[in-house]
Amino acid sequence: MLKYMWYFVYSIIFMFAERSGTDLDKTDAACRNDREPFMKLTETGYAKINLGLDVLGLRPDKYHEVTMVMQAISLADTITITESPELEVTTDRPELEGGPSNLAYKAAVLMGEFARREPRVHIHIEKRIFLTAGLAGGSTDAAAVLRGLNRYWELGLPAEKLERLGAKLGSDVPFCVAGGTALATGRGEILTPLPDLPPLQLVLAKPQMEISTPWAYREFDKQKNVIHPDIDGMVQAVRAGDVPGVLRRLGNVLEPVTAGAHPEIGEIREDMLAYGAEPVMMSGSGPTVFGFVKNRETGERIAGILQSLCLEAAVAELVGRRSV
């Protein structure tokens, strides 16, 4: 009799334990479903300006041979990468295409092909860099995706390898991988890192227009008596830490082309000088104009005035080279 009683007790205990375990499993599953995605990475994509931009001629491959001093600035997009069943790119700007034509999408596909992995990620881009502005906004987002997937997949690729991959996406992408200050040659993809400049303050303004980079280069090819900036002297000044020497040598051979066709750019330049920014120059093929200021307060005052004139405007500072 005692034997059967113990058997009955053990059966009840076993049933309770089994039921409790099942409930715990259900609870764990519910908790897992409520959790954030396992993988979530955030990258900052800094805008770039050209401190110096010279065009040396047209290459056999139809690209232009350039020599530039490129500089990263703190105006930046935020790129968030999370796990997803399939590759998807979204932005907080409805006018910005997030599908396969987006450079960030192309960067994810390229990285997946290189790593032989499916890029099952959702990439969300919070835009703060002006669109179509000559500030490498799309290129810096693509570079951020390269860095982010390099971290996520633990590939351990150095900056130089990511830069070579980025060159397949666009001429500005290699610089945007690590940023800082750099001499760019070739079509812009051959980089020589330079010492970081101090965090100088600047104000930027963009008129409501878009400039086609191919158009700017085609128009440049028609120019006579081009005044070329002293890129070699600027590089020497950067290496010597001679900030006044750097600022004296600002120059962009595309500015007369774009400003000649769009007088608004010259007007912004004159306004910035009148309000206290100096020196002032257009970045890349335009239309964004930037000017250096003594302090952030001055920059914010000028930006406020320019915004009242229906211009996009922001204050930023120079930022150094990042680790990858």
Residue spans for each PLM region:
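ATP-binding N-lobe of GHMP and related small-molecule kinases
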Residues: R35-A133, R151, L155-E163, L197, ...
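ATP-dependent small-molecule kinase catalytic core of the GHMP/sugar-kinase superfamily
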Residues: K40-T44, K48, G52-M68, L155-P279, ...
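Glycine/serine-rich anion-binding loops at beta->alpha junctions
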Residues: H124-W153, S171, E278-V293
